[in-house]
Regions:
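Residue-level detector of the short coil/turn that links helix A to helix B
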Residues: 21, 86, 117, 167, ...
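Single-residue signature of alpha-solenoid repeat helices
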Residues: 26, 91, 122, 172, ...
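TPR repeat positional signature
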Residues: 10, 38-39, 43, 75-78, ...
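Structural register within alpha-helical repeat arrays
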Residues: 13, 41-46, 78, 109, ...
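Solenoid-like repeat scaffolds
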Residues: 27-37, 47-51, 59-70, 81-83, ...
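N-terminal leader/linker segments that initiate helical-solenoid repeat arrays
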Residues: 5-45, 376-398, 407
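Residue at a conserved register position within TPR or TPR-like alpha-solenoid repeats
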Residues: 17, 82, 113, 163, ...
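Catalytic glycan-binding domains that act on GlcNAc-containing polysaccharides
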Residues: 36-37, 44-45, 59-60, 64, ...
Length: 614
């Protein structure tokens, strides 16, 4: 069976030496390889290891190798080196040269500047460290003893604000240190976050001028929705909250949209379509969230308000603002739904030009029938790469490093080099080269992730982006194309994948679910065959639970069967109604992750079926 590059049980001696931190032996072993990249990899690994290099060495490597992976980790090591260097003169020089951001390094730099007689610079650095870090209670006490004049009222408020925004428990300790004029606002924010039923009473103690604070109003809006007061939350958004959003810091704007989106979907269930439209029509939405806001507003206008002019404005804006394949397919499809006659037909033709997307496939089905989807997918052509460019790319440091690491039995590390190249790619040929090299090195997950990044720039990798490195076992009622589509979305075909929640392997099985399906524990869920067998068995059971309705089963696989049943109860059962109703049902899933998941798995399934995995 084909598959991904396995993690070698007996990695090369040079890898073993690096893992043992035997750097002299590792360099000697690397020197035996004709490619100098071998020795550079050892240097790189050493620089990434705590307490093995000076700040100057790490800084020099960073400056000379901006395209190498793990840039953030290197900067962290650089900050650690500055923090731990006992020499004042060296620390001062490194602080001034590299300007670290981590709070421990900031404090070390503050000390060095203070000893050098640079009092104002030292104080400013200490204040940055206090605002951005120093989370431990003992460290707080030490800081306040060492820098008694640094925690000014303004600085102390900024510290509370940063910790509170990050939902750090240390925020609660800061309230007593605040200027009395800001105390009531901080108490109210904490009360809203803690779902205190009496939180609104705290607002009465806040000076009027502070009640328009954007974060305070966002916390209040969240509290109202979470406590079931949707109408009051909408009223707040129609008044103070929407006005405050215009003054929110740019890095907090995404949170405002997330809350508006959640409330809009809850308000839809009550039948207040105008209220839901108001929430979706967010004039201050952050750029990354703008496509979602435009689409939701357009969808509500068309499907709930039956207001075609407003819907067209939103869908046209959506189409114009992004090159993403998914966004283009979605925008053109819904323009086709909103328009009539020949303009509608032309819009659907535009949507059908994106056959690897969910809405592109729906457009093809509407234009010429579902049977035409496979041919359209097969006709999609990826970027052409001149042989000379392919040869040159294979000779770059990143590809040489990845190739060497695969040979050394460390596919995990090789993956980082290829993913970094995908992140830096800006043209179609380079995306294709990263994906093809990943495929040849046995890293299909990198090919998939590269295709996703390319898709955001309007570039399709029709074959490279949908590999089939594993053969799903034959299972009645569960087509191989569907299993491949699930695995692509779940793990990108990385059998070693472990999610933050603890889901494991190709089909991201939770150990408890695997025990339930298998009737026993102790299973090696990183084993591809076992993972597929258990995952397919679980999905097959979901299909039976939901009467064979694929979108319901897919939603249940992602979010759990209880949530899927809740959504059916709230939004109606679309399984026996016209296809348009199911399209709307999917769009009404309240979790953005699950909405996206269902659409991606459906489009993946069609692609794999077109590729022959029936």
């Amino acid at each position: 069976m084909a598959g991904a590059a396995p993690a070698c049980a007996d990695p090369a001696p040079v890898i073993q030496a690096m893992r043992a931190h035997d750097w002299a032996r590792a360099q000697a072993l690397a020197a035996a390889f004709p490619d100098p990249i071998a020795q550079k990899l050892v240097t790189f690994a050493r620089l990434l290891t705590p307490d093995t290099a000076s700040a100057a060495d790490i800084g020099a490597f960073l400056a000379a190798n901006p395209a190498w992976p793990d840039q953030a980790a290197l900067r962290h090591r650089l900050a650690d080196a500055i923090t731990n260097d006992p020499d004042q003169a060296t620390s001062l020089a490194d602080c001034q040269a590299f300007k670290p951001n981590l709070d421990e390094a900031l404090l070390r730099c503050a000390d060095a500047e203070r000893l050098a007689g640079h009092a104002e610079t030292a104080r400013a650095l200490a204040q940055r460290a206090w605002i951005e870090g120093v989370r431990d209670a003992q460290d707080e006490a030490a800081f306040l003893t060492d820098w008694p004049d640094a925690a000014t009222p303004d600085v102390q408020w900024r510290r509370f604000d940063a910790l509170d925004w990050a939902r750090d428990p240390a925020a609660a300790r800061q309230v007593a240190r605040l200027d009395p004029a800001r105390h009531a606002e901080a108490v109210a924010r904490q009360a809203f976050q803690n779902r205190d039923p009496a939180a609104l009473d705290d607002v009465a103690d806040i000076p009027q001028a502070q009640r328009a604070d954007p974060t305070l109003l966002l916390d209040q809006a969240r509290w109202l929705r979470a406590t079931g007061a949707d109408a009051a939350a909408l009223a707040l958004w129609r008044g103070a909250a929407a006005a405050a959003e215009t003054h929110a810091p740019p890095d907090r704007r995404p949170a405002f949209w997330t809350e508006r989106d959640r409330l809009a979907r809850a308000i839809l269930a009550t039948g207040d379509n105008e209220g839901a439209y108001f929430l979706a029509d967010d004039p201050n939405v952050a750029p990354d969230q703008a496509p979602d806001a435009l689409f939701l507003a357009g969808w509500i206008a068309l499907r709930r308000l039956h207001d075609t002019p407003r819907a067209l404005i939103k869908f046209q804006s959506l189409q114009a603002m992004s090159h993403s394949l998914i966004t283009q397919g979605r925008a053109w499809y819904w323009l086709g739904r909103a328009l009539a006659g020949e303009p509608a037909h032309q819009a659907m033709l535009h949507a059908a030009a994106y056959p690897t997307t969910y809405y592109g496939q729906l457009a093809i089905a509407q234009l010429s029938g579902a049977a035409s989807i496979a041919a359209a997918i097969e006709s999609a052509v990826g970027p052409a790469v001149p042989p000379a460019q392919a040869k040159a790319f294979a000779g770059t440091e990143m590809i040489r490093a990845a190739t060497l690491l695969i040979g050394w039995g460390d596919p995990h590390w090789a993956r980082q080099f290829l993913l970094r190249q995908a992140q830096l790619a800006t043209d179609a040929a380079r995306f294709a080269l990263v994906a093809s090299n990943a495929a040849s090195l046995g890293l299909p997950d990198v090919s998939v992730q590269t295709a996703r990044l390319a898709g955001r720039q309007g570039i399709v990798l029709p074959r490279l982006g949908w590999p089939a490195p594993f053969d799903p076992p034959a299972t009645p009622g569960v087509a191989p194309a569907l299993v491949l589509g699930l695995m692509r979305q779940e793990s990108s075909f990385d059998p070693e994948s472990v999610s933050p929640a603890g889901a494991i392997g190709l089909m991201q099985m939770m150990p408890a679910t695997a025990r339930q399906v298998a009737g026993q524990g102790g299973q090696d869920l990183k084993n591809p065959d076992l993972n597929m067998r258990l995952g397919i068995a679980y999905f097959s059971g979901l299909l039976r639970q939901f009467g064979g309705t694929l979108p319901y089963a897919i939603a249940a696989y992602n979010a759990g069967p209880h949530r899927a049943r809740t959504w059916i109860a709230e939004n109606g059962d679309a399984s026996t109604l016209a296809p348009d109703v199911m399209i709307d049902w999917i769009e009404r899933i309240p979790f953005a992750e699950t909405r996206n998941y269902v659409q991606r798995v459906l489009e993946n399934t069609a692609i794999y079926a077109a590729h022959g995995a029936k």
